[in-house]
Amino acid sequence: MSHRADEIRKRLEKRRKQLSGSKRFSTQTVSEKQKPPSWVMVTDQEKHGTLPVYEDNMPTFNGKHPLVKTDSIILKCLLSACLVLVSAIAYKTNIGPVSQIKPAVAKTFETEFQFASASHWFETKFGNPLAFLAPEHKNKEQQIEVGKDLIAPASGKVQQDFQDNGEGIKVETSSDKIDSVKEGYVVEVSKDSQTGLTVKVQHADNTYSIYGELKDVDVALYDFVDKGKKLGSIKLDDHNKGVYYFAMKDGDKFIDPIQVISFE
């Protein structure tokens, strides 16, 4: 009987040792799993179970964006408003010094911006113009044509000379298509009391070509047109003959088109 009791006691002791070893291994495994890798930098605060405190070193701008100078923008807006106000007063009054500003303001607003010259300068200095200035179909061969001999809007016979009015000529032609004599920008499409439906093109050398007595136009304001580009058409009679008006300006001065273009 005592022998059997000793055997049971030994089995219980052996079982207790096995359970004790299993718990020790389990605790060690969990501890190793919780331990961070050796390459992770652990601060003293994290070792003691507290979260690290980070200081915000970003500079403050008191609610103002560092790249936007509000004061400067407001000042420019005020100056612009004052300029517009002075211009309006100059047109509405005839008092002393203020009225003297009127001619200068009028000349400024009447002077057309040199789109063609600006584009040509930009192209010379920096290469091809910006996308919204350059025509999609323009290539290097067409760029070289700037400054070459002018072409006639439409070949024909001159009916009215430059000396008749000191501004332009009238040409009789059998072609209903009117082309641009040189590349440039359309700066005016209007209906004139003397020349009817008229297109005005500005060129890079500060010259202008004017095409009148058109039946319809194929271009719009500020369009770029190449040399030889169709601007519009004229009406032909029963004998397939039509007349168009043409003039050229160098700055503010009219020049005789016959001196620079052959129409026959």
From Swiss-Prot:
SUPFAM superfamilies: Duplicated hybrid motif
Gene Ontology biological process terms, A to Z: sporulation resulting in formation of a cellular spore
Compositionally biased region (Basic and acidic residues): 1-10
UniProt superkingdom: Bacteria
Chain segments carrying region Disordered: 1-37
A cellular component annotation (GO) from this entry: membrane
Forespore intermembrane space side: 91-264
Keywords for the protein's UniProt record, in alphabetical order: Membrane, Sporulation, Transmembrane, Transmembrane helix
Name assigned to this protein: Stage IV sporulation protein FA
Organism: Bacillus subtilis (strain 168)
Gene that specifies this protein: spoIVFA
